[in-house]
């Protein structure tokens, strides 16, 4: 149903503006929506199994911060930094899974707590400041 409504809105906007379905616009929309789509697939699995994960965006923040630090402070190859940051994301998700599975804790409580912990980690490490000076080849990946 959501897909049908999305297509209908796209058609209506194209009729109104005449330039919605251009290759540039489709490419831009695809890049902008890719993170939400990937997270949506993962969250669908979590919700279908009766759980909820509130820490997804915060895990993304930790991983993004880590990859930026690896590239800016240590001059690491962007692809390697992204792979290491992705492995960190898997490890942080495994922490949630460990507490939920082995201690039989409620997923809502565990992920709410780890979300706050991960936010604190990002804040302490970055001191609330953005990480600047990303290499040019890393900016093209975004």
Describe the predicted segments one by one.
Residues 2, 20, 60, 111, ...:
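Electropositive phosphate-/nucleotide-binding environments in soluble metabolic enzymes
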Residues 3-12, 41-42, 62, 83-95, ...:
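Generic alpha-helical transmembrane segments of integral inner-membrane proteins
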Residues 7-74, 98-105:
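Single transmembrane alpha-helix segments in multi-pass membrane proteins
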Residues 107-142:
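Transmembrane helix-bundle core of multi-pass membrane transporters
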